[in-house]
Design a protein with these regions (language model features):
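Conserved polar/disulfide-associated segments of primarily extracytoplasmic proteins
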Residues: 28-36, 65-171, 184
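N-terminal targeting sequences that direct proteins away from the cytosol to non-cytosolic compartments
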Residues: 2-83, 113, 165-166, 173-194
Length: 194
């Protein structure tokens, strides 16, 4: 066999290996980390996450696990009007304690919701306050931010709370248009947790 034929067969083998490994990698990601948009999966995840009263105008739209062991659940609800997203509610459970920045990094830049929870430009200093809740003695600490995800983006309000719940760590973020979002809504969400 000539050198040219050996080289051609070698190139073909490398290309086939690349395609094969890419396919196997894609299958692994889709099996372990892909969004579970089916209604049954979202309902199942709602039961696993937290016992909370979600307002009826919020629709569950995105569910997935953010780790390969399928233990850290993420669920995103949107409130929309005529196909315009007014606000998003993000419930995120993890087995270890984490911050807002870590939660955003864990979700990844490609997942929905981050464009309004990760504010690059703040119009005011972030504010903290506490909300008394029924599931524990201590009130839950809440952070409130007002700003924009980018210079061209609309003004967004972001409320976030991180707390321990039934042996897991929970993050609840409510973000969106300030005309449709207020502190009372977020307080009501936290107070509804059982």
């Amino acid at each position: 066999m000539s050198v040219a034929k050996k080289f051609a067969w070698g190139c073909l083998a490398v290309v086939l290996l690349l395609f094969g490994s890419a396919y196997m990698g894609w299958r692994w990601v889709s099996a372990n980390l892909a969004p579970t948009l089916g209604a049954e999966n979202i309902a199942e995840m709602q039961q696993l996450l937290i016992d909370i009263d979600i307002p009826s105008d919020f629709t569950p739209t995105f569910a997935m696990y953010t780790d390969e062991n399928q233990q850290d659940a993420l669920l995103i609800y949107i409130q929309e009007d005529k196909r315009t997203v007014l606000s998003q509610l993000i419930l995120h459970q993890q087995s270890t304690q984490f911050s807002k920045e870590e939660a955003e990094n864990r979700m990844g830049n490609s997942f929905p919701g981050l464009q309004i929870t990760r504010l690059e430009f703040h119009d005011a200093e972030p504010v903290s306050f506490t909300v008394p809740v029924s599931f524990q003695e201590q009130p839950v600490s809440v952070n409130y931010e007002e700003g924009r995800a980018s210079e061209e983006a609309e003004l967004s309000h972001v409320y976030s709370a991180f707390f321990e719940y039934r042996g897991q760590y929970m993050s609840i973020m409510l973000a969106g248009d300030p005309k449709f979002l207020n502190r009372g809504q977020f307080e009501q969400l936290l107070k509804s947790i059982k």
